[in-house]
Amino acid sequence: MLALEAAQLDGPHFSCLYPDGVFYDLDSCKHSSYPDSEGAPDSLWDWTVAPPVPATPYEAFDPAAAAFSHPQAAQLCYEPPTYSPAGNLELAPSLEAPGPGLPAYPTENFASQTLVPPAYAPYPSPVLSEEEDLPLDSPALEVSDSESDEALVAGPEGKGSEAGTRKKLRLYQFLLGLLTRGDMRECVWWVEPGAGVFQFSSKHKELLARRWGQQKGNRKRMTYQKLARALRNYAKTGEIRKVKRKLTYQFDSALLPAVRRA
């Protein structure tokens, strides 16, 4: 009967006694690619041995002969976004070819572009009328020529009247004053003083119209056409009416006594 003995430890090597009584060396079954327990270097992976020197030496590098060019055909593809320490989302460009399904973004030279100022449509400035372009401190002037137009003139009151006393002057009053005083006889004159009929001069009627415009303080030039329109409007109130004669008009009879007293 064979006696089984325990495995014997002989140094760093192990031996095992099998039932047939033959000892087998376990080290002979160990693969040569692994280091042993003593840390011996592997024969296949010997890192301490320097690599063999190639037979042909490397050519000397000549910086002058080397020519570098900008990779024009290289396409930029963007890797997955990364977060910078400041918390901003940034895209890291890469020179690798874009993967399938990822679009390639063409490079653009922004330095060669010329910036052009944006064109804006001119904003139309408001058109100022003749009344709006007056200075703010200028006195208000009357420009209408209807029969109700009245100019402010200094009142004929005496020294005891208040300063700045003014009264309204109407067109028929202006004409009555000229006819009564005999002013501007070359422009207007009596035809029948007792009946209150008067006539304008066809030659100097515009001069009389300008005088009335100055009396009113109009900025626009007064014409006889405007003055005649105001006289026709007086027919509604009865102060003056048109006579069937060229450039001839007649005052209302109620105004004649005032003319005689003047």
Curated annotation (Swiss-Prot):
Residues 41-61 are annotated as: TAD2. Expressed in plasmacytoid dendritic cells (pDCs) and B-cells, not expressed in T-cells or granulocytes. May also be enriched in stem cell populations of the liver. The gene is SPIB. The protein contains a weakly acidic N-terminal transactivation domain (TAD) followed by a second TAD rich in proline, serine and threonine. Each of these domains may be required for transcriptional activation of a subset of target genes. It comes from the Eukaryota. Coiled coil: none annotated. Changing K242G: Abrogates DNA-binding. One of its GO terms (biological process) is cell differentiation. Residues 140-163 are annotated as: Disordered. Can form homotypic interactions. Interacts with IRF4/Pip. Interacts with JUN. Interacts with TBP. May also interact with CREBBP and EP300. Interacts with NONO/p54(nrb). Keywords: Activator, Cytoplasm, DNA-binding, Nucleus, Transcription, Transcription regulation. It holds the Pfam family Ets. One of its GO terms (cellular component) is nucleus. Residues 169-252 bind DNA. Sequence specific transcriptional activator which binds to the PU-box, a purine-rich DNA sequence (5'-GAGGAA-3') that can act as a lymphoid-specific enhancer. Promotes development of plasmacytoid dendritic cells (pDCs), also known as type 2 DC precursors (pre-DC2) or natural interferon (IFN)-producing cells. These cells have the capacity to produce large amounts of interferon and block viral replication. May be required for B-cell receptor (BCR) signaling, which is necessary for normal B-cell development and antigenic stimulation. Belongs to the ETS family. Residues 1-31 are annotated as: TAD1 (Acidic). This is Transcription factor Spi-B.
